[in-house]
Amino acid sequence: MSIVITRIILTFSILIMSFTNGAIAKDRVVPDNPQPFEEWVADLKTEALGKGISESVFEAAFQDITPDPKVIKLDRHQPEFTQTYFDYISKRVSQTRIKNGLKKVAENADDLAAVEDKIGVQQRFIAGIWGMETNYGGYTGGYNVIKSLATLAYDMRRPTYFRSQLLGALKILEEGHITPENFKGSWAGAMGQGQFMPTSFFAYAYDFDGDAKKDIWTNQKDVYASIANYLKKHGWESNRTWGRQVRLPQDIDGLWEKVKQTGKVKSCRRALKDHSIQLSLPEWQALGVRTIYGADLPKVTDPDFTASLVMPAGKDGPAFLTYKNFRAILSYNCSNYYALGVSLLSDELK
């Protein structure tokens, strides 16, 4: 009798172990690259040194670096879900974020004002992106940027893109903008309080205080100036706002038929495909569009000042006329929800 029981227990234990090991194997995430990681790093080192990275910087950056399974899993299994406009805005333009933002803007008023004066982007928009990206610097990411980018470049899903970002990250270390131990960011390699990728860092990061470092992690002047410089280089107009919520005429379907796009959207298609054609404010006025309070639209006669209509929740939701500055925000993140979140948050941070 005891022999039979022992055999049953043993068989059951084997089944459990088989199931558990199978589940672990199924859940295990490994890089999709047949080349050993050490060989891949050696090839990368040759390329990096050829691009001006010193051996000492490379060795320090890659000390104890191995592929990060968590990063691979996050990259391969990013959640796909549909979030409504109202859910998105209620979470990202919450009263808590507004209250915290007003406090942060007050605490950093001198730095924000100095950046606005020099670069020409209003403080509230700098703060809007700062708040949306990292909750005003509250969380910038705790991943080793070199480890994350090396993992993603080695994984071969988007090797060209992430290899260029990795080489850019090494250049950041080479130029001394930050030390290896403090080089932290998101799992995808976005860095600092404005969440710049390395290539964006070199295109837009700004050394505002002249200390030869573009410190987008801890230097608030550099943080604000870098965000502002990004917007300015994407066409920001310092004497304009982002747009406005508007009231549409009763025949919304008829209006949309007149103003919908029929041509091909060339840039930021994911967001701009949902926009109308661009018209002047007098043209929108003639089509029956009014301010949200029912008043006439501003009497702007500049022919270069145009606006496009977007209804992020469909014709039964809010409608917005968006100006050129809205497109500058879209260049930061090509999402109407994101750009409206920044815009509406900025309105609360005046």
Short names for language-model regions:
Residues P31, W40-D43, E47-G50, E55-D64, ...:
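A contiguous strand-loop segment
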Residues P249-I252, W256-K350:
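C-terminal soluble interaction/assembly domains
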Residues Y85-A228, K232, W242:
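Acidic/His-rich structured neighborhood in mature extracellular/periplasmic domains
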Residues K26-I119:
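An acidic, Gly/Ser/Thr/Pro-rich helix-cap/linker signature
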Residues M1-I9:
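Bacterial N-terminal signal peptides that target proteins for export
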Residues N21-A25:
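Sec/Tat signal peptide C-region and signal peptidase I cleavage site
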